């Protein structure tokens, strides 16, 4: 409650200039030059403005939808390699949003929903592809980890919390959320594996697949606007998930063996098999590209769930050369990001070619793919980023192979053009 009488006319009863209610009939009366407005009229004005904005918002749909070629070009700016996956994703995403813009069935033909399944090793770019597409289309995007999801009634995260997160990303604007993209990672971890005694999830993950089924296919999810139990009497928001694009991703370790068994590819499985080298890695990628729905069923996904993910794209494992490109070529490449950080201190950061190769080699040996690059670069530059704000006159820092291998610190170049190797001494 505000103090309504301290408006310069302490003995006079004040009224809202819009609705005529007195200061005693409203919670707050705001004074202006010879005019007063109550909190109820302010709220009414806000409602009117919100409604007008909502009426204008659908007109955005008339904006030109990027073609598959344009989507692919945008992906090329941020993601290295994975050409086949980019093409599959670009077409699927284009068709999805074309379907939303032409929701009225033509000649009785109703377009089905094309959710996407991405199969590829850790650090190959699955999450980045989904995130980059959402950014290029300017639609809300959220991520979920399938391993944290449970059926209703189990301890864990309810599948409808995914929609809650999407709503949060667009300030609970339902219309915006219904044009969004949801990426569910580690989807292979909820596969049904009855032959694995270590599985402790409910019904070996099948229950979670069943819970996700309706959400992915399309249902009207009732979501509390502020997150559930804290406000039990609030009205629920109704979100139509049939308009949301779901992209599921997973490494699917061992899936190539399932495919080989079906296709009778004699690549050598068992104790007598040869140790896999670079050639075998290419063979694994080629084998995964031949995946069929029946292989995914045998792997542990239920047929109904696979049916809701009709578009399948496989990603190849990144080699050392690709990791070097990832470090320097994309618009938001790691080296460019750290260079921007150093520029804020007035320092130029240079990564020499041998340093990039050494970083890529280290990431390959850790088997983390592109995902492990940031932690490696962060470790290399930690001491330098700690010291530089306190050192006067540094204009350039140089990172070479010896720095990556821990044999020396980055070379610091000062204004007087003396090149000094930063010693570890205090």
From Swiss-Prot:
Domain ClpX-type ZB: 4-57
InterPro entries for this protein: AAA+_ATPase, ATP-dep_Clp_protease_ClpX, ATPase_AAA_core, Clp_ATPase_C, Clp_protease_ATP-bd_su_ClpX, ClpX_bact, P-loop_NTPase, Znf_CppX_C4
Tagged with keyword Repeat: no
SMART domains membership: AAA (SM00382), ClpB_D2-small (SM01086), zf-C4_ClpX (SM00994)
PROSITE patterns attached to this UniProt entry: CLPX_ZB (PS51902)
Positions in coiled-coil regions: none
CDD domains, sorted: RecA-like_ClpX
Keywords: ATP-binding, Chaperone, Metal-binding, Nucleotide-binding, Zinc
Entry-linked Pfam families: AAA_2 (PF07724), ClpB_D2-small (PF10431), zf-C4_ClpX (PF06689)
Function: ATP-dependent specificity component of the Clp protease. It directs the protease to specific substrates. Can perform chaperone functions in the absence of ClpP.
Name of the protein in question: ATP-dependent Clp protease ATP-binding subunit ClpX
